[in-house]
């Protein structure tokens, strides 16, 4: 009996974690518990160093199970409040999800970096800058922008305008001549002027004034008409003289050439006429033969009459 009391008083031996029973039976708490994140503080440090990661494209770091007894993190790291990048609180017991997440504006300062998703949304800290920039862009119309971009071209145009003015002001430029108006005379005026010109080639000042008054013309018009008419008259005289000289020279060059050849019909007539022509008598005729005293040619007369 005392032995049985001693056996009942002794506490049962603790089961070792490496026993068959403990290995076969898996702990539900350990299986359901998510692994601890070792690199979460490193990720926060990277975010603080201006490495902005989008919530949808964050890099996933491997999470390793490390014994907490040997490699235990300090308490201020384990008990820190969750940030906008990770909505879980670190504690000694593991990860416990929190439903209440603090506002980003409380955690993010004015100089904290913003992720790619936050860049798309308007910055609530600097609303004045955006409003001022929008007002400046609206105040500048498209015409003003075009004018600002085309300043060098306007400078070139101004230079070309100044060069054009200099050319106008230069003394070497010849003044443009005004086109003279041509006076149109009536038939009666032309007839009177022609008849006066046939009588007298040159007019005195008094005669020119009287003729201009009778024809209702100015003295200058009458004077110019007489000048042009005299020039025309001189050209006509020169042309007539040249034509007369040419005709006289052509008459002097004419030479009479005798006809040396006739047609067959006229050849017989020419032959008969030639036969009828009398033969001219010789200049020296002797009625009697002349004899020489030479013994060889004594019997040969020198000339015989025909």
UniProtKB/Swiss-Prot annotation:
Chief location bin: nucleus
Q: Which residues cross the membrane?
A: none
Give any Pfam family that matches.
Homeodomain
The record's keywords, sorted A to Z, are:
Developmental protein, Differentiation, DNA-binding, Homeobox, Neurogenesis, Nucleus, Transcription, Transcription regulation
SS bonds (residue pairs): none
Q: Which residues bind DNA?
A: 178-237
Q: Which GO terms describe its biological process?
A: cell differentiation; nervous system development; regulation of transcription by RNA polymerase II
User: What GO MF annotations does this protein's record show?
Assistant: DNA-binding transcription factor activity, RNA polymerase II-specific; RNA polymerase II transcription regulatory region sequence-specific DNA binding
Q: What is this protein called?
A: Homeobox protein HMX3
Native source species: Xenopus laevis (African clawed frog)
